[in-house]
Regions:
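OB-fold ssDNA-binding interfaces and closely related basic DNA-contact patches used
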Residues: 13-84, 89
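Bacterial N-terminal signal peptides
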Residues: 1-9
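Acidic, glycine-rich flexible loop segments
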Residues: 96-150
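Short peripheral tails and domain-boundary helices/loops at the edges of structured domains
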Residues: 152-155
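Context-gated lysine
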Residues: 5, 36, 74-76, 96-100
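Short beta-strand/loop turn elements enriched in aromatics
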Residues: 81-105
Length: 155
């Protein structure tokens, strides 16, 4: 019998991970992203929910009641090595206590903080387009996170 073998390359392909969705990054005027990122989490959003809460954080007086607003995104990882499954976006009314984007590898949750003025923009994206969430970290401490649509043709 004749045995046919698939042709395999004799050398392995270089282990370079290409950055996905780089066209959605802003210009790098300060040269913060000249090196390859240490981490990229890219998630395709498949579902979302909106939560409007009401809480009092303790029995101590005079702690006020707050009303947090957040959007929970669920999805599937798209980039090589990505494990993100959920994005939790909180909205701050005063934009004074925005927190840096953070990824928890244990819970596979990315946490983002936006000013309240961005809520309508986020909801418009989720209602009308395919949405991706991206999170990048660099050795110099730079962090970038965004929500973006895929490329859409103008009508």
């Amino acid at each position: 019998p004749i045995v046919l073998m698939a042709s395999l390359p004799l050398t392995a392909a270089p282990a370079t991970t290409q950055l996905l969705h780089p066209q959605f990054l802003p210009t790098d005027d300060q040269q913060l992203r000249t090196e390859k990122p240490e981490q990229q989490q890219l998630m395709l959003v498949t579902s979302y929910s909106v939560v409007v809460g009401s809480q009092r954080q303790s029995n101590q007086q005079p702690i006020p009641v707050t009303s947090p607003l957040f959007v929970r995104l669920k999805g599937k990882p798209m980039s090589q090595g990505a494990t993100v499954r959920e994005v939790l976006i909180s909205f701050d009314g005063e934009s004074k206590s925005l927190k840096k984007p953070a990824f928890d590898s244990t819970t596979r949750t990315l946490t983002l903080s936006y000013p309240m003025t961005q809520y309508r923009v986020v909801m418009d994206l989720l209602r009308n387009d395919t949405v991706y969430c991206q999170f990048l970290t660099y050795a110099n401490g730079h962090i970038w996170a965004d929500l973006h649509t895929g490329s859409v043709r103008a009508r």
